[in-house]
UniProtKB/Swiss-Prot annotation:
Pfam families given in the database record: FlgH (PF02107)
Lipidation (S-diacylglycerol cysteine): C16
Keywords of the record: Bacterial flagellum, Cell outer membrane, Lipoprotein, Membrane, Palmitate, Repeat, Signal
Cell location: Cell outer membrane; Bacterial flagellum basal body
Membrane topology: Lipid-anchor
Family the entry assigns: Belongs to the FlgH family.
GO function term, MF aspect, one: cytoskeletal motor activity
Protein name: Flagellar L-ring protein
Region forming the signal peptide: 1-15
Function of the molecule: Assembles around the rod to form the L-ring and probably protects the motor/basal body from shearing forces during rotation.
Amino acid sequence: MSRLPSLSSLCLAIACSALLGGCVAAGDVRPFAELAPIVPVVAPVAQPTAGAIYAAGPSLNLYGDRRARDVGDLLTVNLVENTTASSTANTSISKADTVDMSTPTLLGVPLTVNGIDVLRNSTSGDRSFDGKGNTAQSNRMQGSVTVTVMQRLPNGNLVIQGQKNLRLTQGDELVQVQGIVRAADIAPDNSVPSSKVADARIAYGGRGAIAQSNAMGWLSRFFNSRLSPY
């Protein structure tokens, strides 16, 4: 009779864990972080002057380039991220100790029992440690995202922000870009590489079946967490 409550408790715990694991799998595997809100600085619209030849307002440049320079302009960011990192660590420690105690003597006569050196003793110890570790990581991202100029700083730099959301058959893919661009780095085709975006925040993630298939289950996450005894 004493085993029935414990067996029932074990079955209940397994059922609750499976239910919680199903709830986690049904949700988003990698929730997207919201972009930090940036309040655009909008320049006041100049009122037209009746009867004047010149009216202040946005200029219509017929001969210059059309690169982004004002708040609300669009700019294409070419994602050319390519990072590689590797690290190797080797540690080797060894130590050996030996202690030899010879037979003591009394007035020049060795102390023995029936001719046996019972007081003579020797000990030795040997300790060693050898550890090796290797790690390597490589990331590569290519593509393009068109962003919006949110602010124009006093020095002429542009604060940009934007995202691209792709709705695919097996889920969603989202790319977010945020940072600061120098106006001189913008190419004539109104594009800039991501390597020249200062304070860049580039996020890429997904939702759906493909993203869930690459995520560990709740039991695997437990054995890979700090709570695991193994």
